[in-house]
């Protein structure tokens, strides 16, 4: 016989029963995202998904992302309901720029101590984002790792796979001087620049819960979920000659637009064609942030940039408006001189 205490996994800080309770909580919302190509349900060692039969030469497009330190702000403010939408948006918006239809999504949720209510709120948001994007939430991993995170802090990552017809891949190679640039409006800072945002909040001493901006608490502006552009962009791709799409994330205008431009051209953007949403004016003033830094860090109200022939601008804007998007003519493509920058913003 031994006098040693019998230890369990729960004694070490891992509650398997809580994990099972979470799965039971989320089964319903996950089921609502199901696509006909998905085989089986939650609980398997792997998720099975067939390719849609409409594709003759299907090419898979994959992506993974997180939401950065927007998560820290959400935890500090105890607002977890829309972080999942952010997570999906950051992945699916990257896929659609290549013309891909998102097929399925998986998430990774890691925490020091699993709070079932918080995790269920986050995953419900992921399911809501998947429904917006038309992709199935087919599985995920919930990792309770005591000692790795402080208290009930958590981190999330998303993984998405989409499909595009090989002949319809959008890679920017068709962009030409004279092409028009259309902007799709953003819902806020989306999921980028939050380390600077949190620094501005610290330096300014503002409480985002009580500081009002344009009739709403600052927190509402900062935690507005990232807009998911999949449905509108796929519809536009099917009906118009889209030459390129750029999702404005980390690196803002200066770094994301050149990613879809061929050599020898540049994007000329007319700053007078739109007004920054109030949150970006506030951030610039409260943090004394330079104009160049604003365009490098934030989307400044532009979530997606689309290049297409100028003759199609009016019909494209009408189509996007019908889809509920705020869209406007942002600028044009011009010839670039030498090794100069591929983005020029005119004041």
UniProtKB/Swiss-Prot annotation:
Q: Which reaction does it catalyse?
A: 2-formamido-N(1)-(5-O-phospho-beta-D-ribosyl)acetamidine + ATP = 5-amino-1-(5-phospho-beta-D-ribosyl)imidazole + ADP + phosphate + H(+)
Q: Does the keyword Nucleus apply?
A: no
Q: Read off the SUPFAM superfamilies from this record.
A: PurM C-terminal domain-like (SSF56042), PurM N-terminal domain-like (SSF55326)
EC no. given is 6.3.3.1
Query: What does the UniProt entry say about where the protein is found?
Result: Cytoplasm
Q: Pathway involvement?
A: Purine metabolism; IMP biosynthesis via de novo pathway; 5-amino-1-(5-phospho-D-ribosyl)imidazole from N(2)-formyl-N(1)-(5-phospho-D-ribosyl)glycinamide: step 2/2
Q: Which CDD domains match?
A: PurM (cd02196)
MF annotations from Gene Ontology: ATP binding; phosphoribosylamine-glycine ligase activity; phosphoribosylformylglycinamidine cyclo-ligase activity
| Cellular component annotations (GO), alphabetically ordered | cytosol
Q: Which UniProt keywords apply?
A: ATP-binding, Cytoplasm, Ligase, Nucleotide-binding, Purine biosynthesis
Q: Which Gene3D superfamilies match?
A: PurM-like C-terminal domain, PurM-like, N-terminal domain
Q: Does this UniProt record's set of keywords contain Ribosomal protein?
A: no
- Superkingdom of the source species: Bacteria
* Gene Ontology BP terms: 'de novo' IMP biosynthetic process; adenine biosynthetic process
* InterPro entries xrefs: PurM-like_C_dom (IPR010918), PurM-like_C_sf (IPR036676), PurM-like_N (IPR016188), PurM-like_N_sf (IPR036921), PurM_cligase (IPR004733)
Q: Which protein family is it in?
A: Belongs to the AIR synthase family.
What protein name is recorded for this chain?
Answer: Phosphoribosylformylglycinamidine cyclo-ligase
- What does the organism's lineage look like at the top? Bacteria, Pseudomonadati, Pseudomonadota, Gammaproteobacteria, Enterobacterales
Q: Which gene encodes it?
A: purM
């Amino acid at each position: 016989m031994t006098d040693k205490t019998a230890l369990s996994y729960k004694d070490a800080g891992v509650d398997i029963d809580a994990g099972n309770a979470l799965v039971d909580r989320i089964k319903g919302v996950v089921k609502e995202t199901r696509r006909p190509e998905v085989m089986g349900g939650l609980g398997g060692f792997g998720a099975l998904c067939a390719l849609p039969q409409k594709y003759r030469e299907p090419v898979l497009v994959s992506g993974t992302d997180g939401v950065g330190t927007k998560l820290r702000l959400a935890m500090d403010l105890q607002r977890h309901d829309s972080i999942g939408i952010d997570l999906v948006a950051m992945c699916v918006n990257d896929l659609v720029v290549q013309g891909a239809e998102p097929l399925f999504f998986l998430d990774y949720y890691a925490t020091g101590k699993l709070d079932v209510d918080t995790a269920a709120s986050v995953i419900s948001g992921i399911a809501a984002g998947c429904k917006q994007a038309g992709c199935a939430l087919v599985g995920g991993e919930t990792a309770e790792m005591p000692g790795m995170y402080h208290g009930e802090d958590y981190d999330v990552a998303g993984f998405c796979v989409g499909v595009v017809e090989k002949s319809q891949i959008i890679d920017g190679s068709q962009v030409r001087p004279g092409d028009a640039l259309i902007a799709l409006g953003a819902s806020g800072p989306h999921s980028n620049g939050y380390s600077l945002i949190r620094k501005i909040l610290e330096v300014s001493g503002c409480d985002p819960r009580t500081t009002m901006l344009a009739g709403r608490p600052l927190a509402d502006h900062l935690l507005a979920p990232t807009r998911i552009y999949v449905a509108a962009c796929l519809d536009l791709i099917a009906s118009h000659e889209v030459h390129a799409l750029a999702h404005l994330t980390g690196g803002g205008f200066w770094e994301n637009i050149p990613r879809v431009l061929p050599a020898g051209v540049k994007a000329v953007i007319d700053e007078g064609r739109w007004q920054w949403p109030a949150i970006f004016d506030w951030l610039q003033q409260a943090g004394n942030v330079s104009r160049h830094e604003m365009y490098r860090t934030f989307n400044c109200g532009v979530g997606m940039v689309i290049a297409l022939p100028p003759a199609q601008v009016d019909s494209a804007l009408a189509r996007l408006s019908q889809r509920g998007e705020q869209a406007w003519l942002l600028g044009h493509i011009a010839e670039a001189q030498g090794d100069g920058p591929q983005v020029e913003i005119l004041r």
